Amino acid sequence: MASPSRRLQTKPVITCFKSVLLIYTFIFWITGVILLAVGIWGKVSLENYFSLLNEKATNVPFVLIATGTVIILLGTFGCFATCRASAWMLKLYAMFLTLVFLVELVAAIVGFVFRHEIKNSFKNNYEKALKQYNSTGDYRSHAVDKIQNTLHCCGVTDYRDWTDTNYYSEKGFPKSCCKLEDCTPQRDADKVNNEGCFIKVMTIIESEMGVVAGISFGVACFQLIGIFLAYCLSRAITNNQYEIV
């Protein structure tokens, strides 16, 4: 059995670690809310672009939403474990943090490796959407119109991409290519936007996905602090229990 003075020295250490870990867990919980919000924002703001990408790329917002939800639940569990000062719960918390960190690390690596595939996928699907375009609009035609209206662009590389489509042969350029609301006759190249959409879309996606990647990387690194704190508090509690015995 340890001396009373030894136990008195251990208790302030435990109290200190508990306070710091509670603050950390609250901030960690907030990052989960941020990731959840970023995932929802990405799903809404990039929906038109994602509709012209392959299924892997469209899963990105859902991955962020799922990760944010897991972090919120994990943060709640971590707060409970810290308040209870339970050594085994804190070890479990550290293990979950490690697992989530590894998943985020793998996801970041996969996203970096396949970033060129996303570009090629968008370009191929956009070209396909132009060839199959109809003004009454399936979801891809609607996405093309939305992108061209919003970004004031026309075609993939430039407006001439439309000249190879069936729609152009029948009706000319779509209204979404027009500089003004009405550009009749719709075969007049001077009345449509000349710039293509591909470069503009890629600039937006890279910019917004860069924000997402930066936030995700920051959250992942922040988890390392939590792993360290949870492990240290667990050790301190375990040592204190041995000292009492």
From Swiss-Prot:
Residues 41-59, 115-208 are extracellular. Belongs to the tetraspanin (TM4SF) family. The chain crosses the membrane at residues 20-40, 60-80, 94-114, 209-229. GO terms for cellular component: extracellular exosome; plasma membrane. Glycans are attached at N134. Gene3D superfamilies: Tetraspanin. Pfam families: Tetraspanin (PF00335). This is Tetraspanin-6. PANTHER family: TETRASPANIN, TETRASPANIN-6. The gene is TSPAN6. GO terms for biological process: negative regulation of canonical NF-kappaB signal transduction; negative regulation of cytoplasmic pattern recognition receptor signaling pathway; positive regulation of canonical NF-kappaB signal transduction. It comes from Homo sapiens (Human). Its main location: membrane. It is a multi-pass membrane protein. It comes from the Eukaryota. Residues 1-19, 81-93, 230-245 are cytoplasmic.
